[in-house]
Amino acid sequence: MVKHQPLQVYERQLCLSCLTGIYGCRWKRYQRSHDDSSKWECSWFFILCCSFLLLLVWSYFWLEAHNDYNEFNWLLYNRSAIWKDGTVPILAATLTGFTYTAFLMILALCHIVLGQQLNLYWIHKIVVLAILLTTITGVVFIDDFWQDEWDIVIISLQFTGPFLHIGALAVVTALGWVIAGQVVRVERSSDLLLVLYLVPLFISSPCIMDRSKLGPRPAVIGRRGAPMLAPEHTIMSFSKALQQKVTALEADVTISLDGVPFLMRDRTLRRTTNVDKLFPARQDHDASFFNWTEIRSLSAGLWFLRDDPYWTVQYMSEKDRNRTANQTVCSLAELLRLAARTNRSVIFSLRQPPHQHPHHQLWVSDALKAIQRSSILPEQVMWTPDWYRKKVRAAVPLLQQTSDEKLPVAELKERGISTLTLHYSQARAQDIRQFSGSNVSINVYPVNEPWLYSLMWCSGVQSVSSDAPHILKKVPNPVWIMSADEYGLIWITSDLISVAIVIGIFIFQKCDTQWKMSGMRSYNPEQIMLSAVVHRPSRDVNLMKEKLIFSEINNGVGSTDELSGYTGNGLDTYSRDDIMTPARHATKL
């Protein structure tokens, strides 16, 4: 039996095989290459980087837009007339795409570090291109459908900017090995590091301030009660808000067909009542064309248990679920009585009925009558509508005049307005300080996230309207606040550490490159051994080597005819019999 022994033994490289196999389906050793990547593959790497960066921004947008998820779903409902949580498929697709591209990015960077040729598998190329096109489509859709929400990105950077800078610095420093290998050849790559080191010069945040200048904690107003804990605009919702220590209650008021002010946000009753069961032919009619008796007969809680708009029903007790199912539409008079009994203020917006409505011209007086007939003090009511404001002030002088229009201070004083209710995108720190200095209070809406509440707190607002008073109740202090000196120290320290690490990597890379180049100059092909593993010499191995030598002689320069030409030049020639092989040497001995 002939014993066969491999001439060349390779070291197993399972990790490298997995790396190149998953990225480019190159599982075999002979498929891998250390050659420079082709321009085509470099182009696909660029597309992969673009997809990853776009998804990074897209993910950040949806992370910060969590404050307004309900607003997004409400806009979808107004367009489709069907209530659904549209954020779930978007978040699932975004998370999947980001995870996929991030994984491919890591594999690509590992290829670069190990000097492997980039060769993205064709299936990956199709998926990456599909992800890129889908994300671009999503960005265009949001820009058309929800354009105002882009402001949340700019505002959130005031809060997250210092930490994003440190995170980006850490990532670039961690990738210093790859960057250093490029900077050795292309010095302009160092511009990226220089920009990162100087970014804090352009970062400004209201939370970078002395703690002694921090104002009092902003009061929290229950916007439509506590709609995450109970159906919006119901007595149960306002009661839940009062349990969270809110200072005021906010509502949207509509006038019924018989002149009764009641609480309703939507134009129709379809979303928040069972009007489709009791009045199916009128479910798309304007809510103001129902009389109070019809409105009172509707359930205002079953929809909450069915749709679960905030994913909170599973945490409700059985008692609260039964109570929710029995909720009815709340009138303005009921809200005023509840506020008077608990010594809370009330702020509401008033919607004018359509032209065909019998109370189209009487809607303001209907609301004033409800206020005057209740037991609430006039100074506890914050009047927002701009219509007939002078007549309202004359009829009830003690009402707190509030406006949702950002006007100059002089004009606000002329109208007798003492409080501004602004969207958070309009609440700039400089304007807030200006209004506060003129004794004009600022109320900001909607504020549902601790980070946004902290930002408004540091900006100096007096109150915020929130759908989540139970969450803001757990924020006794701003999430973070630091002085300019503290931030400067953190900035300089992190930059110095990064510079030291990157310089160390650069020096090591340069020395390593020079060492390899010096090794190339002393390279001798004869030093290459046929076997990577040392084995004890055997007769079989010697015979195999002898056969290889003779085959090379017969196929190449070893023929007698070719070698005979060199004898005239004084060069020695050898015949096959003159070659002393290890086997012949052993036989001779």
Language model: regions and residue ranges:
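Phosphate-group recognition and catalysis centered on beta-loop-alpha active-site segments
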Residues: M1-L589
